[in-house]
Design a protein with these regions (language model features):
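Sec-dependent signal peptide recognition
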Residues: 1-7
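Sequence signature of WD/YWTD-type beta-propeller architectures
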Residues: 18-384
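Hydrophobic h-region of N-terminal signal peptides that target proteins for export
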Residues: 8-17
Length: 384
C-alpha cells in the first residue's frame, strides 16, 4: 500500500512537471487578501509582486475615497491578518496604479510616490521603524526589484521640467545617479521620436529594471505642461526602449507599448497578445494555441514556466464585458481560467483600476484586483 501511495505521488509530481497548468486547473482557493470591508484594497501593477520577499506580508493601498485617490499604504501579515499602516493621507494620480507601492531592500523598506499640493515626491519607509525618507521631489517612481536596493525614478510625465532622464536611488548609499539619458534615446531613435511625438520634448517614463539588474525598459512621454495630471491628454506616452546599464547604451526599441514585462532570464520581454520579444535581436514569437484576452496585463512566473494575465473573457467562453484571470504554459497549448468577474464597478477613478495579476515569488499564489462590487478588492488565488 505504501508503494502504491509513493508511486501515485511520483506520478502526480511528474504530471505537474510536464504540465505546469495542471496545478492551477482545480481546487484553487480564491479569497480577498484582507477581511476588512468598506474600503478599496489595491495591488499596484503586474510588474511587481505585492508579497514580501520572505513571503510573510502583503503590501497594498487602501482607500475609502469613492475614486481611490486618497488612502493608506499598508502591509498585512499573512499568518494573522494583522495590518500595519506605513503611510497615511497618501494622494495618488489615479486608482489604476495607486501609489506605485513596492518592496525594496529585501523587504526592509517600502517605496511609493505621492502628491501634496500638486508637488510630487518619492518616499521610502523603513518597515521596522516606520521612519519615512523623502528621496526625491518633482519625481515619480518606476519599478525596481524587491530583493535589492535600487529604485528607478523619473520626472513627472506631463511636466518633467529638468528631470527628463532615468535616475536610480540606492538605499545603501543614499545616492541618486543618472543611469540613462533621454539624449541617448534621441541620438539613436531620433527619427522615430520625431514621427511619434511631432518634435515635442520627450522624457523617460515608467522604467522597469530587469531581474538581473543589468537592463531596464521604459516608455517615452511628451508632456503637455501644466499641473493637471488627472487627464488622458496630460502627456503623449508611447513606445518601448530597452537600455543596457553595462553597455551604457540603448539596445532595442519597439514603436508600441503593449504592457510589457520581463521574463525571469532578463533576455526577453513578454507582452499583451502573448508575444515574446528577444531584446538582442528584436525578433518575436507568440505562444501557440493560447487564447488572447483583450486588455491584458501579462506576467511570467518566477520559474519561467507559466504566464498569468487578465482580460476580457469572451474568447474563452465568458460573458460580454466579463474579465478573468488566465494561466497558461509558456510553451503554449495549455491554459486555464481561474476566475471570471465583472470589472465595471469598484474605484471610480478617471483611469480605471485593472486586475494586474502577478505571481508570488514561490509561484504558488497569484495576486490581482477585482472591481465587481462597490469597492475594488485585492484577491489572492492559491493552488493546492
Amino acid at each position: 500500500m505504501k508503494f502504491v501511495f509513493t508511486l501515485a505521488c511520483l506520478l502526480a509530481v511528474r504530471c505537474f512537471a510536464d504540465d505546469p497548468v495542471a496545478a492551477w486547473s482545480k481546487d484553487v482557493r480564491i479569497k480577498p487578501v484582507s477581511s476588512v470591508e468598506g474600503r478599496h484594497s489595491i495591488h499596484t501593477y503586474y510588474v511587481t509582486n505585492p508579497e514580501s520577499p520572505d513571503g510573510k506580508h502583503v503590501l497594498f493601498f487602501t482607500s475609502t475615497h469613492p475614486a481611490g485617490y486618497v488612502g493608506e499604504v499598508r502591509i498585512l501579515e499573512r499568518a494573522t491578518g494583522k495590518e500595519t499602516v506605513l503611510a497615511e493621507n497618501v494622494h495618488t494620480e489615479d486608482a489604476h496604479r495607486a501609489a506605485c507601492q513596492q518592496w525594496l531592500s529585501g523587504g526592509k523598506r517600502v517605496a511609493f510616490h505621492e502628491v501634496i499640493d500638486k508637488k510630487w515626491r518619492v518616499v521610502v519607509v523603513d518597515v521596522a521603524t516606520l521612519e519615512k525618507k523623502i528621496v526625491a521631489e518633482d519625481h515619480q517612481v518606476g519599478f525596481g526589484r524587491p530583493d535589492v536596493d535600487l529604485l528607478p525614478m523619473y520626472g513627472c510625465h506631463w511636466n518633467p521640467g529638468p528631470f527628463r532622464d532615468l535616475e536610480v536611488w540606492d538605499s545603501k548609499t543614499g545616492q541618486t545617479t543618472t543611469r540613462a539619458k533621454i539624449a541617448e534615446v534621441e541620438a539613436k531613435y531620433g527619427e522615430w521620436l520625431a514621427k511619434e511625438f511631432a518634435g515635442k520634448p520627450c522624457s523617460v517614463f515608467f522604467p522597469v529594471i530587469s531581474p538581473d539588474l543589468k537592463r531596464v525598459f521604459f516608455k517615452i512621454a511628451a508632456g503637455n505642461g501644466g499641473d493637471d495630471f488627472m487627464a488622458k491628454n496630460a502627456s503623449h506616452r508611447q513606445g518601448l526602449v530597452c537600455y543596457d546599464f553595462e553597455k551604457s547604451a540603448c539596445i532595442w526599441q519597439h514603436g508600441k507599448w503593449g504592457h510589457p514585462g520581463w521574463t525571469p532570464d532578463s533576455q526577453h520581454i513578454f507582452e499583451m497578445g502573448n508575444v515574446i520579444f528577444d531584446i538582442h535581436t528584436g525578433k518575436y514569437t507568440k505562444l501557440k494555441d493560447v487564447p488572447v484576452l483583450r486588455g491584458s496585463h501579462p506576467s511570467v512566473s518566477p520559474d519561467g514556466k507559466l504566464m498569468v494575465t487578465d482580460g476580457l473573457t469572451e474568447p474563452v467562453g465568458g460573458r460580454p464585458n466579463d474579465w478573468g484571470i488566465q494561466v497558461a504554459d509558456m510553451h503554449g497549448g495549455k491554459w486555464a481560467v481561474l476566475h471570471h468577474f465583472e470589472q465595471n464597478r469598484g474605484a471610480r477613478s478617471w483611469r480605471r483600476n485593472d486586475p494586474h495579476p502577478v505571481f508570488s515569488a514561490d509561484g504558488k499564489r497569484i495576486y490581482y484586483n477585482t472591481s465587481d462590487s462597490q469597492f475594488t478588492r485585492l484577491m489572492v488565488a492559491e493552488r493546492p
